[in-house]
């Protein structure tokens, strides 16, 4: 794998546990600042479903040999620069940073066929430039009823758009036609971003 990555080292990336939506926003911001010509090829991807119960494997917070965890939602970053190359940058995975799309999807999501329908995963894919403009969160979802934090927040101020409204729910929602970007099932997501060996060979001729 080439070493010409958007983010040379995972240690150089902004990261706070349990704030994946903000971690990915910071990745988008970093690309805009350091590699602006690549921003149009980058995406923020939310994974969730109606019941907000999505199993993911190979996660740092996971348990057992397979490191599986059930999240209410998760967010990761995609760089799709070429017809034969698509990379996933996930700050919470135990897979390499980055990982080729096919390997990431195969090991992180496996298949919906063996899962109950209520655990099927859906994906909201948002262009990075759109995400930088429209995402807004006052972090209310991380507070208990008494106002204390479920998990310590990032040290920087909340990310608020010009509307100054908390809209995290619009990104987690997996209803097609609502919210920014496009919503895909797992199979549709793979069809849109997987670069098959045949396509790679054709483009390398």
UniProtKB/Swiss-Prot annotation:
It is an enzyme of class 3 (hydrolase). GO terms for cellular component: cytosol; nucleus. InterPro entries: N_Gln_amidohydro_ab_roll_sf, NTAQ1, Prot_N_Gln_amidohydro_ab_roll. It catalyses: N-terminal L-glutaminyl-[protein] + H2O = N-terminal L-glutamyl-[protein] + NH4(+). The active site is at 20, 74, 90. Its EC number is 3.5.1.122. Disulfide bonds: none annotated. It holds the Pfam family Nt_Gln_amidase. Gene3D superfamilies: Protein N-terminal glutamine amidohydrolase, alpha beta roll. One of its GO terms (molecular function) is protein-N-terminal asparagine amidohydrolase activity. Keywords: Hydrolase. Mediates the side-chain deamidation of N-terminal glutamine residues to glutamate, an important step in N-end rule pathway of protein degradation. Conversion of the resulting N-terminal glutamine to glutamate renders the protein susceptible to arginylation, polyubiquitination and degradation as specified by the N-end rule. Does not act on substrates with internal or C-terminal glutamine and does not act on non-glutamine residues in any position. Monomer. Belongs to the NTAQ1 family. This is Protein N-terminal glutamine amidohydrolase.
């Amino acid at each position: 794998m080439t070493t010409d990555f958007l983010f040379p080292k995972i240690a150089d990336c902004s990261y706070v546990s349990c704030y994946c939506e903000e971690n990915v926003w910071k990745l988008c911001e970093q690309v805009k600042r350091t590699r602006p010509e690549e921003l149009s090829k980058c995406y923020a991807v939310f994974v969730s479903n109606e019941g907000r119960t999505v199993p993911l494997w190979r996660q740092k917070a996971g348990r057992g040999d397979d490191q599986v965890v059930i999240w209410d939602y998760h967010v990761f970053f995609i760089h799709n620069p070429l017809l034969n190359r698509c990379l996933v940058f996930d700050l919470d995975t135990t897979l390499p940073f980055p990982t080729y799309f096919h390997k990431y999807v195969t090991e992180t999501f496996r298949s919906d066929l063996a899962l109950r329908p209520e655990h099927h995963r859906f994906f909201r894919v948002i262009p990075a430039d759109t995400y930088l403009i429209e995402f807004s969160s006052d972090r209310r979802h991380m507070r208990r009823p008494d106002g204390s934090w479920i998990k310590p927040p990032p040290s920087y101020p909340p990310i608020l758009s010009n509307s100054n409204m908390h809209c995290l729910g619009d990104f987690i929602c997996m209803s097609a036609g609502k919210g920014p970007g496009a919503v895909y099932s797992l199979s549709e997501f793979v069809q849109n971003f997987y670069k098959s060996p045949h396509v790679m060979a054709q483009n390398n001729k």
